[in-house]
């Protein structure tokens, strides 16, 4: 029996031991054969996944190491992003796990080469796999053989000398968190004080700064939070202004959850970037066209967020708005959007209106059974934010749902609600109508980066469309689609993302 790991009693690794032993006996493979060539040499990629892929891993592995096994469809997608080169690049798998990504890379490279033993050994020699979990590294040595470099270490403590030992490609699905999971809004049972540590940004930084050669490629599957542009870590700025994005493909939290069989819930992106230079445009995957299209990064000083669904319809909307801005010499500045904050501690709330709690506030907005938007209210002993101001309130966490408060009757008692202040009744009604259209809802969807919450980045494109000089038609969706020069196919796609219908 070939022992994998120090703790053979661990169920997962005991199964792997049995699987390896059975396969070797069935195919008359000796230990020397496997040690020299690696077990992967004797397996097809499909066989490798059927033997070793486990969609569900232990809670300890997931929370302590941040380990998640990457499904084959996603791995193939990542490998397809890599440039085709005649020479064999040096490749680093930064958090190898059980070697799924490296195995797919090696087999893909092998299939496009002369299938000689020498070529296989050369591919293996070009690979370096780093993995913190020692049980996994034992299995990696068995799978990849003695020609590959397998390092049992923390990737963030790995510092190769770039001039001699740098890598042409760094690839991987880095751990998102380690030492415990990160609390998300939907998890009501976890205390944020018990949070683990988010490390995926550090993996990106470390790969670029300390592992890649100049003009080397980074191919990662990571959360897409950096794409909205206001990340405190500065990753958006670093990626776009110090490196060149080659292509990206975004995945919604629902699609990610589907890929990982219910073991993921994060909006993610596969990104291929090239070290050095500056990003001016890149290939952006359109879920509308099911293909890549060119995305131009130069959207003006107020536009930094990168869309997630597609850039084709977004480009048409942007082109139309920019043309009327240029024609009439209007401001390119987005309409002013205010995001509510947490109430001061001195403000107390009640579900009932009393003499001590006279001020009425909006908590949130919801859909009623008949499809009309309804509001949940409470009362406070002090006026809450925006009380007394004429405004448009977007109180629904996912869709906004424009609510007019022309008299300024309501305050806002919850954080993360969006407010537009405007005294002109006609203009604010026009904006309210526009923000309830399928087109506006689609644009909101195109700029969502965490769960399904409405983001402030989703308003960067929104200029003051109520300005009569712009000439936008109000009250007629078909006329609006025509004004933006959308095709019937465009319109159909936009409508499919309108999950709720609004009533005047």
Regions found by a protein language model. Give the residues of each.
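C-terminal substrate-recognition regions of SAM-dependent nucleic acid methyltransferases
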Residues: 255-493
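Signature of N6-adenine DNA methyltransferases within the class I
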Residues: 70-77, 95-106, 121-124, 132-138, ...
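Glycine- and acidic
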Residues: 59-64, 91, 185-190, 412-420
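Structural motif
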Residues: 3-6, 10, 194-198, 425-426, ...
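Conserved acidic residues
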Residues: 89, 168, 391
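Class I S-adenosyl-L-methionine
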Residues: 1-120, 128-143, 458-502
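Short, well-structured alpha-helical interface segments that form or flank functional binding sites
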Residues: 64, 73, 100, 198, ...
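Short active-site oxyanion
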Residues: 124-128, 417
